[in-house]
Amino acid sequence: MKLNVLYEDNHLIVVEKPAGMLVQGDKTGDPCLMDEVKKYLKEKYKKSGNVFLGLVHRLDRPVGGVVLFAKTGKGASRLSAQFRERSVEKYYFAVVVGKMKEKSGKIVSFLKKDEKKNVAEVFTCEVPGTKRAELFWEQVSSGKENSLLKIKLGTGRTHQIRAQLASINHPILGDVKYGAPKPLPDKFIALFAASLSFKLATQDEAKTIELPWPKVWEKYLN
């Protein structure tokens, strides 16, 4: 594949993940983004041995967008700390089923991972085993049947955006796991990680990497 490198320095690399591709290899043995980035670095710097690449965050397989990797141990430690401390700002775009009643809103709920079904269950109040989840959404545009939202995460839980939007009866287009009426081609879902803002690994300098929402979505907003 042709890797879309969005930013690179001595300690980190930011690339665009295609929707449908794994970030990290799993038992399926399907191609993954980490292997592609390692291949790119090995060829670019003519490295003969193994290439270090640190995974500091993830995107679900059916989601495309901005992904950040560490190229050094120091980079991995400092970037992981930023994600852990929630100092990284993340924005997403999503096409959801239905028309929104408001122009913007906030969803606060409690999520619990069902390991067997690989889904996040949503609760309106805290119960044992749940974690608080918060997101903010703003309507960008709408069509006859769907709406385009810009989403900012207040927390970073597994399947958070997918589960929380479904909980207010606006599942993400194509996300049949969370109640969308039908899948999209190639089992993608209309969720895109559009922006990451973070501090560089060895400098006190803020960096924002952005991508526009996929224009292929326009047909879902007519």
Regions from the language model: what does each represent?
Residues 1-222:
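RNA pseudouridine synthases
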